[in-house]
């Protein structure tokens, strides 16, 4: 004999069934949320726009369960306070109390609009760049150091010119014909390939600065960050 509900049971059954279905649906939703892992990456706008974001689709295709959130900022993120899993920073790799992995050190190259170079004096040596307006990064160090590395004595002109906080802005200013910019090669690659920018002098300079993946101690061993870092190292190695 099958079990039969009492008249009272029949009255409450639809409500109970609905409640159980809701519980089942909520548990399934919770499982889906737990399976979906979020990873927050902080990096500078130029690196995000020209290098990281165009490649992210490959990572997402291989790891669909990981949802990457990219925060592009020129400010150094506080990993603990801002709940950031990994910061990709450009510097000397000196980040006390954090796990640091070197990624790559793109060389600095002088770029300008082809029209500006065609209409201006010929550039054969590094010193010839001083005949043009120089576009500076915020600290106004790169041109001075690059010229010195090329054997040019310190010249006050090496620190003059408008300054920009990010390579993306330097690239845009150079494209607009405002002068010669010294930028990391990876940030001007698309513009050079399309002919919007030209290399003013084939003297790439291996800057002491490099890109580093920085995370909280021990975090790099746990998924999803371990997966992301392995992918990042693989992508960076392909640049070398």
Which residues are covered by each model-predicted region?
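Central regulatory/effector-binding core of bacterial HTH transcription factors
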Residues: 36-96
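Conserved G/P- and acidic residue-centered "switch" motifs that form tight phosphate/ATP-binding loops
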Residues: 6, 85, 177
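C-terminal regulatory
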Residues: 81, 93-208, 235-240
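Short amphipathic alpha-helical coupling segments at ligand-binding clamshell hinges
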Residues: 51, 184, 220-234, 239-240
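Short, well-ordered beta-strand segments
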Residues: 40-42, 87, 111, 135, ...
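A short, exposed helix-loop element centered on a Lys and neighboring polar residues
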Residues: 24-31
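Immediate post-signal peptide segment of exported/extracytoplasmic ligand-binding proteins
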Residues: 32-39, 130
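Basic, amphipathic "hinge/linker" alpha-helix immediately C-terminal to the N-terminal HTH DNA-binding motif
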Residues: 1-22
